[in-house]
Amino acid sequence: MLHTLTRSLRENKGPALVTVLLSALEVVFEIVIPLFMSNLIDFGIEGGSMAAVWKFGAFLLLLAAFQLATGVLAARIAARASVGFAANLREDMFDNVQTFAFSNIDKFSTASIVTRLTTDTTNVQNAFQMLMRMAIRAPVMLIFSMIVSFRISHDISMTFLIILPILALALFFIIRSVFPVFSRVFRTYDELNNVVQENVRGIRVVKSFNQEQHEIGKFGAISERIYKDFSKGERLITLNAPLMQFCIYTCMIVISWLGAKAIIASGNDPALGLTTGNLTALITYTMQILSSLMMLSMVFAMLTISLSSARRIAEVLEEQSDIPQPEQPVMTVRDGAVDFDHVSFVYASKADKKVLDDIDLHIRSGETIGIIGGTGASKSSLVQLIPRLYDVTGGKLTLGGVDVRDYDLDTLRGAVAMVLQKNELFSGTIAENLLWGNENATDEQLRHACELACADGFISAMPDGYDTHIEQGGTNVSGGQKQRLCIARALLKKPKVLILDDSTSAVDTRTDAQIQQALSTYIPDTTKIIIAQRISSVQNADRIVVLDDGHIDAVGCHDELLRTCEIYREVYESQQKGGEDDA
């Protein structure tokens, strides 16, 4: 995990190292200051020498200025390095998500990925910034303050050896108790984000069914769980502060008492024992030792909170796409011939059940294939294998005579245009959305593609035409308009294979027929695979495939299937009857 995260440091390694060095230098100045303060008291104030006061006072001011300068500089560089590190983490996670196959995406919910890109990354950023500063300052200050303290008075400094184990033990139990609590908190954040996303995305459904209070209750229940767990974790962490304060004041009292006895015994003579200046330095070092322990406890507390976040980020960064690039990829797709050679497929999450079994289907280049089947017949699963959104788990699938696993992924997906069941438009103008199909398309090409998809009419009727702004998710266009825009976008790719996955379900039958006629007339060399619920959408196809529970039940033209396929005939008759009833 650590190696995975540190790869994202990149250009921030230098600033991080400089921060560490500056923090160490800051501690050196801080350690030296009490020694000069001791000399100022012993030789200046107690010795009655103003020259010594001026001399050591000047050194103290100079050291304090250097300490301030190094501290401020270290803090600024640490902030810049931590922000850069967080930016790299987000970029690396987002880039890796773009390489995921659908099977990889299935492992992470959308809300979980959003949480990892935001909350988890911020937690790691804060921990990294604290690590660069406190994780260096605290141990260096602790070690050197202990060394100097023992040099001043071995006997009095033994007090630390009693206090330190108590603090270490308490800190161990606090961290061990806190870690599982915060791990649970960040998992619950995923649930909370998921509820928010679902509610915002489906707000029209929520309002139409009067389910606002139900959604508020669902959100409140998860929010309450986060509140309780976070409160529990914070309560455990806050035990650290009073414990540290108790130890600090106990040490101060014990050291002051022992120091006073030693000064009285020595007569404040440095040759005979402890002096007032030594005791002042010792008390200052005591504060430094205990404050360094407090800093360490804060570091451990922050690391405890961020460790869960770091692991969740590492999970995304370490996830390897289930669709690997071939070592020597084929860079050209010859034509749109698609051959399923006894193909089978299972989803990783449901490995015990075959979604597709022994699919043997051979599609000629330029042929129009219709696919009909009931819900759960695996129609979408079948066509998603062609652009390698998933890989076959048995048999062989070829495009243009080449196994799809041998193609360069960009080449393969560039040759296959797919309009999915869930059509997605992005924030921007209509033209910008269409250019996803071909970023170099001219205005004439955009208009021609929209004419084929029967979209040019409603676009031209809009006040801003092709410059009309599309809201997030395409909420300001109807379902049928969205489908036609997505078909036009796919046509701009000029693909070898065009897949329409129930992509005209929201348009009327007349418009559907116009789209099918346009596709047949204007792109005859493109292989067209049309999944539909309405038989009218596919009845003019060269061949129609009837899928039933992941198996091919029948293949043939419309008239042939009416005679030989019971499933097809039942669907056709029910739709015909439904059409008559509607009439």
Predicted features, each with a name:
Residues 331-583:
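ABC-type nucleotide-binding domain
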Residues 11, 15-27, 59-60, 69, ...:
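Transmembrane helices of ABC transporter permease
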Residues 11-13, 99-103, 119-132, 136, ...:
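An intracellular "coupling" helix at the cytosolic face of ABC transporter transmembrane type-1 domains
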Residues 1-30, 37, 45-56, 66, ...:
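Membrane-integrated ABC transporters
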Residues 21-22, 29-42, 63-110, 114, ...:
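Juxtamembrane helix-loop junctions of ABC transporter transmembrane domains
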Residues 93, 97, 206, 313, ...:
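Helix-loop junctions and hydrophobic alpha-helical segments within the transmembrane domains
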Residues 49-53, 58, 148-162, 232-312, ...:
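Helix-loop-helix
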Residues 97, 219, 313, 340-342:
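Conserved catalytic Walker-motif region of ABC-type ATPase nucleotide-binding domains
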